[in-house]
Amino acid sequence: MLLHIPHVLTREQVRACRARLDAADWADGRITAGSQSAQVKRNLQLPQSSPVAQELSAQVEQTLRQHPLFFSAALPKRFFPPLFNRYEGGMNFGNHVDNALRYLPGTTDAVRTDVSATLFLSDPDEYDGGELVVEDTYGVHSVKLPAGDIVVYPSTSLHRVEPVSRGARVASFMWIQSLVREDARRTLLFDMDMNIQRLRERHGDTEELVGLTSAYHNLLRLWAEV
């Protein structure tokens, strides 16, 4: 499932975040790449040790944990702390699949990457190129969203970032270990949840809706890893 969630951050939040990021010291983005990804990764990244990165990362994670649509889609169990990258002057990231495991900084504690997400912090008119291209079983998807919007997709997807030929593409990117590791099961649960909410708005808590809600939670109980 590839999902676009609009307005995760307000315009004011985006402006405040960008002001901090634009004044920060960036490093070579290959510092967090695996051996294969490092060969095709050409971007800048805010070091995880940076106080600015740590503060903004915590804010992004807190916002997403409290967002009902994101929670329903990702069913987050654990986050790898959100990171920040920047593409400019022809930078790009070739086709790759995210590492299956990410180790929390300074530990041997691993986060399984089930869900990947990119939170856009630049508007489309600020740069040329820079599309996130995600390939899955349903085809090829080119994503370029307004600042403050996020795209969520399975970490098993082959994806790339096209070269940026003008301006700068700034974003936060992250990985989530889900309570439900399989994308097909998460998609089914998400579709059920969305339709349950629509039925509740239209008809209230009918006996049939209570039954559907029970089925949702029993499926989650069956599939969740806690």
From Swiss-Prot:
One of its GO terms (biological process) is intracellular iron ion homeostasis. Gene3D superfamilies: q2cbj1_9rhob like domain, Rabenosyn, Rab binding domain. 2-oxoglutarate binds at residue 169. GO terms for molecular function: 2-oxoglutarate-dependent dioxygenase activity; iron ion binding; L-ascorbic acid binding. Keywords: Dioxygenase, Iron, Metal-binding, Oxidoreductase, Vitamin C. It holds the Pfam family PKHD_C. Residues 78-178 form the Fe2OG dioxygenase domain. Fe cation binds at residues 96, 98, 159. Its cofactor is Fe(2+); L-ascorbate. Its EC number is 1.14.11.-. Binds 1 Fe(2+) ion per subunit. The keyword Ubl conjugation does not apply. NCBIfam families: PRK05467.1-2, PRK05467.1-3, PRK05467.1-4. HAMAP family: Hydroxyl_YbiX. This is PKHD-type hydroxylase LHK_00496. The lineage of its organism: Bacteria, Pseudomonadati, Pseudomonadota, Betaproteobacteria, Neisseriales.
